Structure formats: structure tokens, C-alpha cells
């Protein structure tokens, strides 16, 4: 089973792809493959960030509820 790439690994890979695309050393076919791989990585990265954003929102809402129960109007 393949190891799941971390956010940091994907971000580094995306930065490498962007650097390669900016050098103009790739032919058209290589550029398209790199571009497609980059788009896939961006989508994976956004999914990870969306997941963490949802978790933060839940934690924040729980803490606000806890705070209002502890210190709210009685």
C-alpha cells in the first residue's frame, strides 16, 4: 500500500512543478503532464485545508458554547 503524502510533501511537490514550468526547459507534452499533476495536487491540498477549516470551526463553536455556558447570562 502506498504511503499517503502529507500536506507539506504535496506543497513541496507543487512548488517543484511550478519551478519546472517556469524554466521553459520542458517540451509541450512534459509541460501538460506537469500542469495536470499540479492541478491534481492543488485539489488535494484544498481538500486537506477544507477539512482542517471544518475541524477548526467545530472546535471554535464548541469552545464558544462552553464559554457561554460557563460565563453566559444566568
Swiss-Prot record:
Its main location: cytoplasm. One of its GO terms (biological process) is DNA catabolic process. It catalyses: Exonucleolytic cleavage in either 5'- to 3'- or 3'- to 5'-direction to yield nucleoside 5'-phosphates. The keyword Hydrolase applies. Belongs to the XseB family. Pfam families: Exonuc_VII_S. GO terms for cellular component: cytosol; exodeoxyribonuclease VII complex. Heterooligomer composed of large and small subunits. It comes from Clostridium beijerinckii (strain ATCC 51743 / NCIMB 8052). This is Exodeoxyribonuclease 7 small subunit. Keywords: Cytoplasm, Exonuclease, Hydrolase, Nuclease. Gene3D superfamilies: Exonuclease VII, small subunit. The keyword Signal does not apply. It comes from the Bacteria. Bidirectionally degrades single-stranded DNA into large acid-insoluble oligonucleotides, which are then degraded further into small acid-soluble oligonucleotides. It is found in: Cytoplasm. One of its GO terms (molecular function) is exodeoxyribonuclease VII activity. Its EC number is 3.1.11.6. PANTHER family: EXODEOXYRIBONUCLEASE 7 SMALL SUBUNIT.
Amino acid at each position: 500500500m502506498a504511503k499517503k503524502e502529507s500536506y507539506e510533501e504535496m506543497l513541496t511537490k507543487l512548488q517543484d512543478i511550478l519551478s519546472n514550468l517556469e524554466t521553459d526547459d520542458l517540451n509541450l507534452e512534459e509541460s501538460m503532464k506537469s500542469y495536470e499533476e499540479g492541478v491534481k495536487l492543488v485539489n488535494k491540498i484544498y481538500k486537506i485545508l477544507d477539512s482542517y477549516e471544518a475541524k477548526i470551526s467545530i472546535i471554535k463553536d464548541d469552545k464558544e458554547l462552553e464559554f457561554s455556558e460557563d460565563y453566559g447570562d444566568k
